[in-house]
Regions:
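Extended, alpha-helix-rich binding/interface surfaces that flank or overlap catalytic cores
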Residues: 2-59, 69-77, 84-179
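Boundary/linker elements of alpha-helical solenoid repeat scaffolds
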Residues: 60-64
Length: 179
């Protein structure tokens, strides 16, 4: 049975910082994974938001090459990110992602494979080729768009931390240890 909800905490929902909303969703997904809940059972839009944050975080950490390296350039993940960017209305980010993906597809699979196997911090012309600072100049804020998407989603429930645990415990069928 799929968990048909996106859960964010009251604290996050009331925060002025949109990253708090995104982080709340991430925390719920991480907790569900710790409880061995398969991704297929987690709300697909909650997961999409999770992976959009992964993309944005990796880009901010080390540009497009960092995302490619740390994701292993996973086709399924890339499709999810494309769908997610479109869904939250990040049209400029979507166009850049598609452009970067095309650039990568034109490269040799051997070069990509070597890049993915090497340590990221090693000097690498392939890494430099992948980077594109246009991301940082776009006037679309992915965190704000992602948070607004989560807050306005029809399946989103804003709950206290106790209510969050109770809801998840009902789904998994046992008490969840709180740290």
């Amino acid at each position: 049975m799929e968990f048909g909800k996106i859960i964010i905490s009251e604290t996050a929902a009331n925060s002025e910082n949109p990253q708090d909303v995104v982080n709340s969703n991430i925390s719920v997904i991480n907790l569900m994974r710790e409880e061995k809940i398969d991704d297929d059972l987690i709300h697909e839009d909650a997961l999409m938001s999770y992976y959009l944050d992964f993309y944005a975080s990796k880009y901010a950490e080390g540009n497009f090459s960092k995302f490619v390296h740390d994701s292993g350039w996973n086709k399924e993940l890339n499709e999810l990110i494309e769908e997610g960017l479109a869904l939250i209305g990040a049209e400029k980010h979507l166009e850049l992602f598609k452009e970067q993906s095309r650039k990568l597809r034109l490269q040799s699979n051997i070069k990509l494979g070597k890049f993915l196997k090497d340590k990221y911090d090693a000097p690498n012309a392939f890494k430099d080729l992948l980077n594109n600072n246009a991301y940082f100049e776009l006037d679309e804020n992915l965190v704000e768009l992602n948070a607004a998407f989560l807050k306005s989603h029809p399946d989103t429930e804003v709950l206290s931390v106790d209510e969050m645990f109770k809801t998840l415990e009902e789904f998994v069928g046992h008490e969840i240890k709180r740290d």
